[in-house]
Amino acid sequence: MKKIAVTSERSYEVEIGRSYLEALIEIAQGRERVAVIYSEAMKEQIPTFDFGGAEAFYFGIADGEAGKSARTLESIWNWLGAAGFTRSDLIIGIGGGAVTDLAGYAAASWLRGLDWVAVPTTVAGMVDAAIGGKTGVNSEYGKNLIGAFHSPSQVIIDLKWLETLSDRDYAAGLAEVVKTGFISDVTILDLLDGKNIKSIRKN
């Protein structure tokens, strides 16, 4: 897998390729417990992990912003407590931006900070939501009002997840690609200019 270093107060690597299972198993080595938080809409696509001695716990949440709530977060806290999660254990978030935001904030707030890994499965998640360490949940007064900066230990981008997206969802994520291009590198826009969604996905 290709690796890109992200330098910050809590530096980490973004791995890009097609073998996220191997990468997760490697980072879970030496842990006693691993929590896998995922979208219920993806339940059939989430494998039963063999973390080589670490006990795996699975927590499915409602799809999209509906699952990114303080109530869901409280359920995760209770679940982590019942399972005996300690500072040396690991949280993994597999899904779109709502899932990685929630998993990251659960990690930030439990015992003042657990390691966590983001496995984004959408274009927007791969380009924006899982990168940078912004984590949080929504409240009844607005989106992302409760949160913290807590960078992941690792971001694992498996390009195979893109094959599961509809053209509509794929195209929606390209808006984040365009935004990133304007902010960071306008040459990115050349990859999209004059192309339809079919040709972009093919390449």
Model regions: which residues?
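Conserved active-site and cofactor/substrate-binding residues in soluble primary-metabolism enzymes
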Residues: 19, 71, 169-172, 187, ...
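Short glycine-/acidic-enriched loop or helix-start segments at secondary-structure transitions
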Residues: 45-48, 102-104, 128
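A glycine/threonine-rich phosphate-anchoring loop and its flanking beta-alpha core
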Residues: 105-198
